Amino acid sequence: MAKKRPSKPGYGALFKAAKSASNLLVLFIPSQARDEQPINQDHWRDEALTALGKLFGGATAYPKGKGVWRDDDQGGKLLFDEPIVVQCYTSEEAIRRQAGALREFLVWMGTECRQGAVGFVIDRDYLEIRFPLTRKGG
């Protein structure tokens, strides 16, 4: 039978930190809509920072990257994008407690920005909320 290691104190205790959060939440703020029309990315970056600040105590946005998303509803069309990455550290308890409000924000952003999906990451899990393809005039 293997010996059980004694538990180590967490880094929060080690550094006498006022806050310790070990769950990573990452959002992607798109630069364009599904129809490749630009969106007001700075507005949505600020909305995301505000939402994560209120829900989880803070967040950081990183400059534009380069990305691609395959839109299967449009026959596998590749949509290239320059997303802003927003991340925050929080607790599992806070994520569970604020899940409804976070989902509400993500659906709002995805709808208003005319996205095919809104992707986000919690720790190692990539999650995606999809939106149906809407045709102009229909």
Placement of each model-derived feature along the sequence:
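Positively charged, small/polar-rich N-terminal and surface patches that mediate targeting and assembly
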Residues: 2-138
